[in-house]
């Protein structure tokens, strides 16, 4: 599923974001295949330290085209991978 529409097998991974404006932690899951999902949870205060925010807080502009992208107060975030190279290796 990409933006609510089906996609071809192995075309794109699917990312599901679970959040609440009142919660401190956010959770996301990436569908790896029919049997495996990779989940992550992060503290929204800490994630601001090593991330790049893409989009504007007013909404309407973001880096993706699928729903619910470009929503007010929910910009896209990208991780600075360089800081995690030792852990990745």
Swiss-Prot record:
Swiss-Prot/TrEMBL keywords: Disulfide bond, Fibrinolytic toxin, Glycoprotein, Hemostasis impairing toxin, Hydrolase, Hypotensive agent, Protease, Secreted, Serine protease, Toxin
Active site (record annotation): 45
GO biological process: proteolysis; regulation of blood pressure
Span of the signal peptide: none
Annotated EC: 3.4.21.-
Temperature and activity: Optimum temperature is 37 degrees Celsius.
PTM per Swiss-Prot/TrEMBL: Glycosylated.
Tissue-wise expression: Expressed by the venom gland.
Lineage top rank: taxon: Eukaryota
Major subcellular location class: secreted
Disulphide bridges: 64-69
Cell compartment(s), UniProt: Secreted
GO CC annotation terms, alphabetical: extracellular region
pH dependence as annotated: Optimum pH is 7.4.
Activity control, per UniProt: Inhibited by PMSF. Not inhibited by benzamidine.
A GO molecular-function annotation: serine-type peptidase activity
Annotated ranges, domain Peptidase S1: 1-89
More details: Negative results: does not have clotting activities. Does not stimulate platelet aggregation. Does not act on plasminogen.
Entry function: Snake venom serine protease that cleaves fibrinogen alpha and beta chains (FGA and FGB), but not gamma chains. Exhibits fibrinolytic and kininogenolytic. Preferentially cleaves after Arg and Lys residues.
Family to which this protein belongs: Belongs to the peptidase S1 family. Snake venom subfamily.
Name of the molecule in the record: Snake venom serine protease rhinocerase
Species in which this protein is naturally found: Bitis rhinoceros (West African gaboon viper)
